[in-house]
Design a protein with these regions (language model features):
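LRR N-terminal entry segment and analogous cap-like coil->beta motifs
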Residues: 1-4, 9
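N-terminal capping/linker segments that flank leucine-rich repeat
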Residues: 8-10, 29, 92-94, 110-144
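Short, solvent-exposed linear patches
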Residues: 8-13, 29-34, 50-55, 71-76, ...
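Canonical leucine-rich repeat
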Residues: 4, 25-27, 46, 67, ...
Length: 144
């Protein structure tokens, strides 16, 4: 599948469109969406629109260069590894609130800066599979 139109599904709360050939995704007409899995596509942009209900986002193995999560205060799980982002800011989300045991997966060689919410303590960073998963030059900063 190379295109997906879910604009008529305004009550949609879960969408799994993983492992396709999508290059973009528009969920701007799905304000009730709480869980999105679009892993393993070639997506370079996601249009979230004004919706802010998202709690889980899995967008690993795509071509995303940016991800604006500032309006997703309820987002508690993010899998965005293997994309092309240089900066990732999760400071406005609920990631790290303790709801998920592994709330953040953001392994990518391109990542230079990771912003976390002040008070969230990193318990571990795994680099056992590949030393480039969390690049040694990635700066981790905290925001209030």
């Amino acid at each position: 599948m190379t295109e997906l139109n879910v604009s008529k599904n305004v009550a949609l709360n879960y969408l799994n469109c993983a492992t396709n050939k999508l290059t973009s995704l528009d969920i701007s007409k799905n304000p009730a969406l709480t869980s999105l899995n679009c892993n393993n596509n070639t997506i370079n942009s996601i249009n979230f629109g004004d919706g802010d209900a998202l709690e889980e986002l899995r967008c690993q193995s795509n071509r995303l260069t940016e991800l604006n999560l500032s309006k997703f205060a309820s987002l508690s799980l993010l899998g965005c590894a293997y994309n092309q982002m240089t900066t990732l800011d999760v400071s406005m989300t609920a990631i790290g609130s303790g709801k998920e045991s592994t709330p953040l997966s953001c392994q990518m060689e391109s990542l230079k800066t990771l912003y976390l919410k002040t008070g969230w303590e990193i318990q571990y960073i795994t680099v056992d599979r590949s030393p480039s998963l969390i690049h040694v030059n990635t700066v981790i900063e905290y925001k209030d």
